[in-house]
């Protein structure tokens, strides 16, 4: 899940800790670039924080700790879910600004 906050609540941390095996953070520019790429490739526009969840498998594939943590057999049965909500609540003119920012960052 992409949390648009600096720190999740301690209550949430306690509730999900049995199910959590890792966490990461992304810079905003990464999420804006992903927003533009997803819009161009799939026609989906999500708010930037929703894109954070999509990058997890990329980080896992690059990290030797995670590579040793999950066997190829386990990975072949894995399902990665992204909590991709929020795009429909963003005003169209704001979403267009997000998209334009992502495109600009991709072209730098």
Model-identified regions with their sequence ranges:
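Phosphate-binding loop/pocket of nucleotide- and phosphate-handling active sites
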Residues: 54-108
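Active-site-adjacent helical/loop segments in soluble small-molecule enzymes
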Residues: 7-75
